[in-house]
């Protein structure tokens, strides 16, 4: 974990929200990224680098929350309007929280990658957490969703290298042409 200075106003704290994607009914875990035509929803633990993939959104949230949210809606689209689910997210302890979800397609479509980290981000002008994407997720991200008070910075090279785009402070159904399908590392601030 590396801290890196960024120019970020410290006055805005993003809400924990969930964007839309469609889940496929089956909770069987798989490894890697799904074959064409089938979306997978993966959760990645930033500390260990361990990634598990599932066919349902509910299963990913169960794992990402450490079992504290076992009854999430079947799709992220349904979760957006679910006040009980939002309250459950906000009640998670400050350790091992969901920091962001990244989608293969615009409008929160296709496969998704939910990244879990050790805590919420501080609004102190620094990148609090950084992650180099595994090969199967490099150059695939088209929409993003920040959680746990994190703003997302997207970089075209590993190690937060190259020109960055962001911060993405709220749900972004299309990240724009600068980093669309070019992200290789992510800064969480």
Report residues per predicted region.
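Hydrophobic h-region of N-terminal signal peptides that target proteins for export
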Residues: 16-23
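Compact beta-sheet-dominated domain cores in extracellular/mature segments
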Residues: 2-13, 25-189
């Amino acid at each position: 974990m590396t801290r890196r200075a960024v120019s970020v106003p410290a006055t805005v704290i993003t809400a924990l929200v969930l964007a839309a994607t469609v889940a496929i009914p089956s909770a069987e875990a798989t490894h890697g990224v799904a074959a064409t035509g089938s979306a997978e929803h993966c959760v990645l633990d930033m500390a260990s680098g361990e990634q598990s993939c599932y066919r349902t959104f509910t299963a990913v949230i169960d794992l990402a929350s450490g079992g504290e949210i076992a009854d999430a809606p079947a799709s992220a689209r349904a979760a957006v309007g679910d006040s009980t689910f939002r309250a459950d997210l906000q009640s998670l302890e400050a350790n091992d929280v969901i920091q962001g979800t990244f989608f293969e397609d615009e409008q929160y479509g296709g496969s998704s990658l939910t990244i879990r980290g050790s805590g919420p981000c501080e609004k102190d002008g620094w990148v609090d957490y950084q992650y180099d994407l595994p090969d199967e997720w490099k150059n695939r991200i088209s929409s993003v969703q920040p959680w746990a008070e994190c703003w997302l910075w997207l970089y075209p090279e590993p190690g937060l290298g190259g020109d960055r785009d962001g911060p993405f402070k709220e749900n972004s159904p299309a990240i724009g042409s600068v980093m669309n399908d070019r992200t290789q590392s992510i800064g969480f601030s």
